[in-house]
Structures are given as C-alpha cells and as structure tokens.
A protein has these predicted regions:
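Basic helix-turn-helix/winged-helix DNA-binding cores
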Residues: 1-64
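Conserved active-site tyrosine of GNAT-family acetyltransferases
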Residues: 24, 43, 147, 154, ...
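Short, charged amphipathic alpha-helical surface segments
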Residues: 71-131
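Class I (Rossmann-like) S-adenosyl-L-methionine-dependent methyltransferase catalytic domain
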Residues: 115-185, 190, 199-232, 237-242, ...
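Class I SAM-dependent methyltransferase core
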Residues: 194
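A conserved beta-strand element that flanks and buttresses the S-adenosyl-L-methionine
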Residues: 254
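Short catalytic micro-motifs in class I SAM-dependent methyltransferases
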Residues: 257-258
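A short glycine-rich, Lys/Arg-flanked "PGG" loop and its adjoining helix->strand segment in the class I
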Residues: 268-280
Length: 328
C-alpha cells in the first residue's frame, strides 16, 4: 500500500512552511491528489521527490519559470541551458557586489581620513563614478562577431585561411609555441585557465599532456564543439572582463586569437582580471594578432599595465601579424 502524507506532514518532513507548498502548487510545480470528500491534499512519495527537486533548484537561485521548464523537459541540453544561465547570473552578481565592496572600502577610508567634511561628498561622487564606469565597461561588452554561428565551421575556416591577409597561416605554430612556453614554466600539478577556449584546439594539447586545464568562452556553441572534441575538457561560460573564478586560482593563464577583440579600455580591465585570478608567481601567455601599425602600441599597453603588478612583457614575433607574448 502506498504511503500518503498530508500537507502538514510534508512541511514538517522537509522543514518548510505549508504556505511554500501551496505556492508551488499554485505555480503549477506540484499537483497533489485531493480526497474526494473533503478535498484535502494528499502527497505520495513521487510528490515528495518532486518537491525536494524544486527546493534544490531554488537553493541554486533558479526562477520558478526556469524550474517549471526543467520539470517539463528534462533533456540534457535543457538542463545545460538553465544551469549556464544561472552560472552567468551568479557570476555577474558576484562581480557587481565585488565592485560595490571596493567602492565602500575606499569611501570608508575617506571618511576616516578626510578632515574637511564638505570635501567628503565630492570624494564619494568621484569614487562611485569610477566604479560605475568600470561596471559599464564590463557589462557593455558584446559578441560582435557571432562566434556561436561560426563555431561549427571554425576549425575548417582556420585550416582554409581564405582571407587575403593569411592571418592563420601560422595558427598551429602559435598554438604549439604557447603550449611549449607553458610546459617549460609550470609544475605538473599547476592549474591552467584558457580564456577564449573556442573549439579546444590549444586545450587539447594540454589534455594530451595530462595537464589540469579549464577553458572558458562567451560562446555556448564554441564550448559545445570543444566538449564534443575533448569530452574530458572542463568548460565554463566566461570572458576576459568577468572571469568566473576566485582570486589567485591559477598558475598559468593562456589565450590565443581572442585578446585582440577587445578595445583599449577593455584590455586594461582584462589585464586586471587576469592578474586577479593569477597566482603571485604565475604567468600569462598570449598568442594573438597584432597588426603592424598597432603592434608596438599594443605591446606598450601590455607592458605599462602589467608593470604595476611587478610583471614584465617578453614577446616573440611569428610573422607579420602573429605574436606570442609572455607576461612574467
């Protein structure tokens, strides 16, 4: 005989209120049985399992609408879509709160140190304005190149290198040099982050060498292709301006054919973000395009920005457009 429970028993069992259960029922997430005479709710074991699932998803911050969609379609791709959405929402909020905390820290120092009270408001406004500008740079970046649409054709397009400039002529050489730079530097147990992992061509080299690498990319379709090619590769949604990891997490950061997509202000933010998640004795290796009339400008920008972190820039020019840059 099947065990049945009242709403009060379920609430006590799961340490929640009866109102919460009624709310989920009202939203269509639960459909308990009703007694024919008094219309009291009756819950079976399946209802308990479903409610526990709902509570678990809510603990991850998923919306009622997202949970409803997952319960209606429990396919892998649907799970992935909603979990990636929540991953990005959480990461965005962490970065937003982090900037607020930095602003408050600076404001508190000003309050303690400023002797002229009338100057405080001016200082506050300047601090908040600087913080807002940084958040604006981070939040306004958009994929203007449709990498999702390019993902399935990317590898073939790189091989064909159909453009007049032949910018991918030494693509494999650049990837191999970045790989060798890392292998010559890092310990075998070191953690590597690749930003703009794309279809996994560089990450695959590290995987074959049994290195611990995580790849992030803002393109879901690029990540999907990378995961198909390298099932053991750990991939996450993420980008230069809001890296989804804690301070001093990685021994090495690598990136190829991605950094040049940022403008000058975005590059500064990206360098600060990379330095934030890089361990103090860590290293950054970039393989990227630098057009001749801009190469010196880009290298000078890198050198100036990393100098404040006690780092220096060493680079090798591969051809007219391609450079491998080490920040060490």
């Amino acid at each position: 005989m099947k065990t049945e429970y009242t709403i009060s028993q379920i609430a006590e069992k799961l340490h929640i209120t009866t109102n919460k259960i009624r709310f989920y029922e009202k939203k269509g997430l639960l459909t308990p049985m009703r007694e024919s005479q008094n219309r009291y709710r009756k819950f079976g074991e399946e209802d308990i399992f479903r409610l526990e699932t709902i509570l678990l998803y809510r603990s991850l911050g998923l919306s009622i609408e997202a949970i409803q969609n997952i319960l209606q379609c429990n396919k892998k791709e649907n799970y992935l879509t909603h979990m990636q959405n929540q991953w990005m929402a959480v990461n965005n909020e962490i970065h937003r709160l982090s900037e607020i905390r930095k602003s408050l820290e600076t404001v508190l120092d000003k309050v303690y140190e400023e002797s002229e009270e009338q100057e405080l408001e001016k200082d506050f406004l300047k601090i908040i304005e600087q913080s807002n500008l940084l958040c604006q740079v981070k939040n306004e970046w958009k994929d203007q190149w449709d990498f999702d649409g390019w993902a399935r054709a990317y590898d073939e397009d790189v091989k064909r290198d159909a453009g007049v400039l032949k910018i991918y002529e030494n693509y494999e050489t650049v990837l191999q040099m970045v790989f060798e730079e890392v292998e010559n530097f890092q310990r075998k147990d070191g953690k590597i982050l690749e930003i703009g992992v794309g279809t996994g061509n560089l990450a695959g080299k590290f995987l074959q060498n049994k290195d611990h690498i995580i790849g992030i990319d803002q393109s879901r379709q690029m990540l999907a292709v990378a995961k198909e090619k390298y099932p053991k590769l750990h991939v996450r949604l993420g980008e230069f301006l809001k890296i989804p990891y804690e301070n001093q997490t990685f021994d090495v950061i690598v990136s190829t054919y991605a950094f040049h997509h940022l403008n000058e202000e975005e590059k500064r933010v990206a360098i600060a973000e990379m330095m934030r998640v890089l361990k103090k004795d860590g290293r950054i290796i970039l393989g990227d395009l630098m057009f001749q009339n801009k190469a010196e400008e880009h290298l000078n920008l890198l050198a100036k920005e990393v100098e404040q972190y006690g780092k220096r820039v060493v680079y090798k020019r591969i051809d007219r457009f391609n450079y491998v840059v080490a920040i060490q």
